[in-house]
Structures are given as structure tokens and as C-alpha cells.
């Protein structure tokens, strides 16, 4: 028989927590994208999104949630550096950015 320390407390099976974490990740990725578009060129945001998927998901075989997490870390760092260097955007944003030739990549979540 399992001791009291070995049982899972009621309401903490882990399933709810995992589901909530995935929802938080999706909401946070969308939120940072909506804010980043006011500070960073759209093409930069799109390229980071595409390259994150290509590298972490396609090449390394990591899960979708891990790929989103790595993308989120990169975007948080980009936003931090942008702010640290003295953001003067004042919500004006950078517009669509200078697209390369050819069609633009599909947008990341929150920028559809």
C-alpha cells in the first residue's frame, strides 16, 4: 500500500496543469507577437517563426509545444534587447517591413 506521500493530492493529477500550460503558451505566443509587431519589423518576426519551426520541429523533431517555447524565448530576448537599447517606437511600429522577393511566409499566431 502506498504511503500518504506517494499519493497525488485531489485536483492535482497533472493533466489539468499540462493543459493549462499549453493554453498559457499559446496565449503568450499570440500576445508577444501582437506586441512585437509594434517594435520589430514584421519580416523579422515571420522569419524567426519560420526558422524556429524548420529547425526545432522539422530538423530536430521536437514537439509543437517545445518549438513554440523556443520561439517565445527568442522573441522575449529580441524584445528585451530592443527595449534595453532605448525603444522609441511609441506604438507606431515599423509597418510591413522590407519583404524579400516572393510571397511572404505564413504569419505566426496572433498576426493573422
From Swiss-Prot:
Keyword Membrane among record annotations: no
Residues covered by region (Disordered): 92-112
Coiled-coil boundaries: none
Lineage top rank: taxon: Viruses
Motif stretch (Nuclear localization signal): 65-72
Region Binds to human NUP153, residue ranges: 61-80
GO cellular component: host cell nucleus; virion component
One GO-annotated biological process of the protein: viral life cycle
Keyword set includes ATP-binding: no
Keywords: AIDS, Host nucleus, Host-virus interaction, Inhibition of host innate immune response by virus, Viral immunoevasion, Virion
Pfam family, one: VPR
Job description of the protein: Plays a role in nuclear translocation of the viral pre-integration complex (PIC), thus is required for the virus to infect non-dividing cells. Targets specific host proteins for degradation by the 26S proteasome. Acts by associating with the cellular CUL4A-DDB1 E3 ligase complex through direct interaction with host VPRPB/DCAF-1. This change in the E3 ligase substrate specificity results in the degradation of host SAMHD1. In turn, SAMHD1 depletion allows viral replication in host myeloid cells by preventing SAMHD1-mediated hydrolysis of intracellular dNTPs necessary for reverse transcription.
Subunit structure: Interacts with the P6 region of unprocessed GAG. Interacts with host VPRBP/DCAF1, leading to change substrate specificity of the CUL4A-DDB1 E3 ligase complex. Interacts with host NUP153.
Protein name per UniProt: Protein Vpx
